[in-house]
Regions:
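Acidic/glycine-rich phosphate/pyrophosphate-binding loops and surrounding catalytic core
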Residues: 1-219, 223, 235-240, 252-254, ...
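Alpha-helix termini
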Residues: 242-248
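Active-site loop ensemble at the mouth of alpha/beta enzyme cores that anchors a bound cofactor
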Residues: 290-294
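Short secondary-structure boundary segments
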Residues: 228, 257, 279
């Protein structure tokens, strides 16, 4: 899925930049380059070298996307990497050296950098949250609050920062929320319906009270999301779940809502298994990069 998504995302980004958004178009490579009217100022035969550096500290991510950009622009630009996805980087560190036709480098630079700076931003923020969980068994999860068209890319970036993926989409796990419960009639009925429909898929139930948690435990769901619980309620939920575990039951507990870089550590200390944070992919601040021809 990821490999295919990289190819499609890069094509869409290049088409957006070069003004060819007709999915049925079959423009030649030379015609695509002609669309970059500024690059046309440079002789087609000119070969150039360039260096990509980071201006700030963070976690690098996006290598495959950058490579795909220049592959789709003819494959004549050689990329010599000095980092891998997941590597910590510092200000002014050399990330990559490029060599090839000057037109191709300049046509692809912004698209390649857009992917790298965005995904590195996700990975860097993820690491900040993960660091706050040090000393606990709690694991950080992402959400579906992603940039449209970049779901798998952002979720990959989360793993590069040390986080884990929640469900990828609506197809790989059940997440039974308030409206689903209301439509099904109860938590128990919703869980049973899920088991009957797809016995192989994980079933998670979102609850808003200890009473609803009890219902989800009795229904034997796999995971329970504690939505907007305060710390006192989280502690009570963990204690209740431990009592169920002592009887051979119990679930994994996930915390969601009101999670910030300042609150996540205290939430983790309650003993929950997971904390999901939409900000990882929703509040994206790009890593500052710079590319210069030599």
């Amino acid at each position: 899925m990821l490999e295919n998504d990289i190819r499609l995302a890069v094509k869409a980004a290049l088409d957006e930049d070069l003004g060819h958004q007709d999915p049925n178009s079959s423009l030649s490579l030379s015609q695509r380059f002609d669309a970059d009217i500024t690059a046309m100022l440079i002789p087609a035969e000119k070969i150039a070298q360039a260096s990509l550096i980071t201006r700030e500290e963070g976690v690098f991510c996006g290598k495959a996307w950058a490579e795909q950009v220049f592959n789709q622009l003819g494959g004549e630009v050689a990329l010599h990497w000095h980092v891998d996805d997941g590597d910590l980087v510092v200000p002014n560190q050399l990330l990559c050296e490029l060599e090839g036709p000057a037109r191709a480098i300049l046509t692809g630079e912004r698209t390649a950098m857009n992917f790298i700076q965005t995904l590195s931003g996700v990975a860097s923020l993820t690491k900040r949250y993960v660091d706050k969980l040090s000393g606990t068994h709690t694991r950080l999860l992402d959400t579906r609050k992603t940039i449209p068209g970049l779901r798998t890319a952002q979720k990959y970036a989360v793993t590069c920062g040390g986080g884990q993926n929640h469900r990828i989409g609506l197809f790989d796990a059940f997440l039974i929320k308030e409206n689903h419960i209301m439509a099904c009639g109860s938590i128990d009925k919703a869980v049973k319906a899920a088991r009957k429909l797809h016995a192989d898929k994980p079933v998670e139930v979102e609850v808003e009270s200890i009473d609803e948690l009890t219902q989800a435990l009795d229904a034997q769901s796999d995971i329970v999301m504690l939505d907007n619980f305060d710390v006192t309620m989280m502690l009570e939920a963990v204690e209740l779940n431990n009592r169920y575990k002592a009887k051979g039951l119990g679930v994994k507990l996930e915390v969601s809502g009101d999670v910030t870089i300042d609150t996540i550590s205290n939430f983790a200390k309650t003993g929950v298994d997971y904390i999901s944070v939409g900000a990882l992919t929703k509040h994206v601040r790009a890593l500052d990069l710079s590319l210069r021809l030599k």
